[in-house]
């Protein structure tokens, strides 16, 4: 597996650093605490994520209707609860895959002054 060094301090970046951020294209180095930016893979990842969200909503509606014919009580469960229970494992797996992909294939830059300059 390819290790990507921090452009500021030179220490290796990890997927945990990307996952701890709210936005996958901006995160902090765990060693020097400087904000890093990633430009190469963020836009395609976000487009795929939006498409996956739309697909999941459609599939959840189909699943709820199919389960509603077998168990009528499912029709009275709010769609948000149904979506959280079904989509949370998918979210966790995709978050880890995105972090791994950003670390391996991303173009990570630092906009501030380099250490020692």
UniProtKB/Swiss-Prot annotation:
It is found in: Cell membrane. The keyword Transmembrane applies. Its main location: membrane. It comes from the Bacteria. It is a multi-pass membrane protein. GO terms for cellular component: plasma membrane. Keywords: Cell membrane, Membrane, Transmembrane, Transmembrane helix. Disruption phenotype: Cells lacking this gene show no difference in growth under copper deprivation or copper excess conditions. Induction: Significantly induced under copper-limiting conditions. The chain crosses the membrane at residues 43-63, 73-93. This is Uncharacterized protein YcnL. It comes from Bacillus subtilis (strain 168).
